[in-house]
Each structure stands twice: as structure tokens, then as C-alpha cells.
Amino acid sequence: MIEWREEGVLLSVRPHGETSVIVEAFTRAHGRHLGVVRGGVSRKLAPVLQPGAQLDLRWKARLEDHMGAFTVEPVRGRAAAVLGDRLALSAMSSALALARFSLAERAAYPGFYDQTVALLDALAEGTGWLPAYLDWEMALLDQMGFGLDLSGCAVRGVNEDLAFVSPRTGRAVSRQAAGAWVDRLLPLPEVMLGGPAHLHGVLEGLTTTGHFLEHKLAPALGNRPPPEARARFIDVLSRAR
């Protein structure tokens, strides 16, 4: 029998038989991991198994490559805290869906896990989460091998007046170097460089990360389209202007 115990974030839940569910969790040491929770539809467990929840997970299986089973205990819920905030709820749904879409099963991403927990906690608290979400998408691209290089201009090598990102290379481009290519470049708002986090700037940043999610990451994952939850979040955010 193989067994481990660790805290994790609940990414998704789906029915399995009449009384059980299959949960997908993201943990620090074991990555994105699936398992059966017996009795998961019960009055005791159903309220605990809400996407975004922080859980104490114990996983057991006879063999390493088996799906195995989870027993779960609540650490802290987050769904109730965002239910009354459509924007935060859509952001949480987007982050959970992107994690499911992108992360390799059973591969550890310890630093990115910590950043995910911090983002979800910020969403539940309702403070400072908008730039944190943009940072999270940038970190996701980096983890997947498509990180943006914003350290200096790809054309001139300078690190001043950076205003655009090359849609091909993901490298920054200065305003002066953009020239006739300016209409083909992606925006590089100040927030992506550690500047003020205005709504317009965050939306511009998400336009840029969205390009790489759709045109770089998705093709690498078998040309599956990015999750609709992200498009819904961008729509809700755009209407919040």
C-alpha cells in the first residue's frame, strides 16, 4: 500500500457512481493529483468539497499508478467568501480551470503551488488580488516553459521605456524600437513591470498573457482551447471598468 498526506487545493469534483466523487487536487509535493472520495456526495462531505477549498488530504493506493482514494478534512473554505463577488468568483474559477488545463499530472510545482494558495487566499479576503492574478498567469506561463522576458528590449538591449511584448518571442520591446511593428506587438503595461495596478493596465496585461496561453501553451498541450472560465473572467473584468 502506498500512502501520503499533504495539504492541497481542490481544483474540481465530479460524480463517481452513486455516492462517491473523483476529486482533482493540487498539492505542493505531489502536484495535480486525482483520487476517489467515497461518500463524497454525503451531507458531511459535499459542503467541504467545494472548488478552491484548502484540504488536508490523505491518499492511498495499492500501486503507484492507480488512481487511489482520498480521505479529506477541511482546512479552510474559500467558495463562500467569493460567492457574493462575481468578479472574484470568476477569477477563482479561471485560476482553477487554468491549473487543471496546464499542469502535468503528479508533477510537483512547489513555488507555483505557494503562489496559487496566496492568490486564492487574496481572492477570499477580497483585497489586492487583481495584480496577483496577472502575476499568477505570468508565473504559469513561466512554469510551462513560455515565460516572458521583460528584463530589457529585445531589439536595443535597453531596459528603459519598455512598452510592448513580441508576440513571437515573449521578449520586451521599447517604445523607440517598436517602429513600424507597433501594431503587431502586444501591450506591456506598467503593472507587468511592478508599477501601479490600474484596471486598464491589468486588462492589457491579461491580453498579453492570453495570447501566449492561446498561441503557445495550448498548441503544446495538443491544441486544446484554453478553458472557457478564463474568457468569462475577462468578460466580467472588462464590464467592471
Curated annotation (Swiss-Prot):
Keyword DNA damage recorded: yes
Pfam families given in the database record: RecO_C (PF02565), RecO_N (PF11967)
UniProt family annotation: Belongs to the RecO family.
Claim: DNA repair is one of the keywords in the record: yes
Keywords: DNA damage, DNA recombination, DNA repair
Name this protein carries in UniProt: DNA repair protein RecO
Protein role: Involved in DNA repair and RecF pathway recombination.
GO cellular component terms given for this protein: bacterial nucleoid
Taxonomy, superkingdom: Bacteria
Naturally occurring in which organism (per UniProt): Dinoroseobacter shibae (strain DSM 16493 / NCIMB 14021 / DFL 12)
GO BP, one annotated term: DNA recombination
InterPro entries: ARFGAP/RecO, DNA_rep/recomb_RecO_N, NA-bd_OB-fold, RecO, RecO_C
